[in-house]
């Protein structure tokens, strides 16, 4: 079984991984922005801590470190990084995240597309690139 971490929108790869017996999508970085238990006695402080701890607030290096941390913690075989067209943050940060993951020996696939309008995504091309990446991950897994 190949374990995949995801950065950004999953809509570009959902169909390829749904109900797959060979591959499993572990998580999206959008869901682990600030993992801590809120204090019900101090809801506003808890909200502030969550906002300040969000990986989207601050430098991309912090987000890259968190992505690497979660990929290691969840034993991901690879990471798919979705870059939304026109988003300077994700496009500019993709290389930084790739470099950080390479330090840990985790390969990354970058997919570019429109995260807002699915009609602007070439599903066939994305599926082909994802399948090639999954084959690479499978070869790496067998070689170990």
Show the residue positions of the predicted features:
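Single conserved hydrophobic/aromatic residue that forms the stacking wall/gate
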Residues: 1-8, 12-15
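Small-residue-rich helix-loop
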Residues: 28-36
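Hydrophobic alpha/beta core scaffold segments
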Residues: 18-22, 27, 40-46, 50, ...
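Charged, low-complexity surface segments at secondary-structure and domain boundaries
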Residues: 12, 34, 114-118
């Amino acid at each position: 079984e190949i374990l995949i971490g995801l950065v950004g929108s999953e809509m570009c790869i959902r169909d390829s991984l749904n109900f797959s017996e060979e591959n499993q999508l572990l998580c999206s970085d959008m869901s682990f922005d600030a993992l801590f238990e809120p204090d019900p006695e101090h809801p506003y402080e808890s909200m502030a801590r969550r906002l300040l701890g969000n990986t989207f607030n601050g430098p991309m290096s912090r987000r890259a470190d968190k992505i690497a941390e979660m990929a290691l913690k969840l034993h991901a075989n690879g990471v798919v990084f979705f870059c939304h067209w026109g988003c300077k943050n994700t496009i500019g940060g993709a290389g930084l995240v790739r470099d950080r993951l390479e330090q840990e020996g985790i390969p990354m696939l970058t997919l570019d597309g429109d995260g807002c309008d699915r009609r602007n995504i070439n599903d066939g091309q994305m599926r082909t690139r994802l399948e090639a990446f999954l084959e690479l991950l499978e070869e790496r897994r067998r070689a170990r």
